[in-house]
Amino acid sequence: MEDFKYRNYYVLRVTGGQEINVALILEERIKTNNINEIFSVVVPPNIKGYVILEATGPHVVKLISSGIRHVKGVAHGLIQKEDVTKFVSKSVALPAVKEGDLVEVISGPFRGMQAQVVRVESTKNEVVLNILESSYPVQVTVPLEQVKPVKR
């Protein structure tokens, strides 16, 4: 297998909602035609109507995508690798809580209840809470994204 120096990211415009179907067809064409100039096919999860191909040149992208029903064409220009990683990486802003903080549970079976943070397990993204609205002390472990800070 040849080692290609230049890997560029090209954007295919496709019919909205057909991104996964187009990606599967592209994958099948790449395998059956033994094309080694395309390195990856990316379907950005939050962007409708686009499929990103990592390839050596635009001629390869046009060759492999020609004749596919839902492909509208190749977008002009290239896209940077940093932009592609931004599209596909999962970045969730977790609330900053520490022991002793008052929080409100925003989802799950304890939704709407006030609680006090007993312990934060940052490796698991979980928090141990003491529910304040119960008649006896109840400690529960919930995911960190299910709480919202109220007071410190």
Curated annotation (Swiss-Prot):
The keyword Transcription regulation applies. Keywords: Transcription, Transcription regulation. GO terms for biological process: regulation of DNA-templated transcription; transcription elongation-coupled chromatin remodeling. InterPro entries: KOW, NGN-domain, NGN-like_dom, NGN_dom_sf, Rib_uL2_dom2, Ribosomal_uL24_CS, Spt5_arc, Translation_prot_SH3-like_sf. Coiled coil: none annotated. Residues 99-129 form the KOW domain. Pfam families: KOW, Spt5-NGN. GO terms for cellular component: ribosome. One of its GO terms (molecular function) is structural constituent of ribosome. CDD domains: KOW_NusG (cd06091), NGN_Arch (cd09887). Stimulates transcription elongation. Belongs to the archaeal Spt5 family. Heterodimer composed of Spt4 and Spt5. Interacts with RNA polymerase (RNAP). This is Transcription elongation factor Spt5. The lineage of its organism: Archaea, Thermoproteota, Thermoprotei, Sulfolobales, Sulfolobaceae.
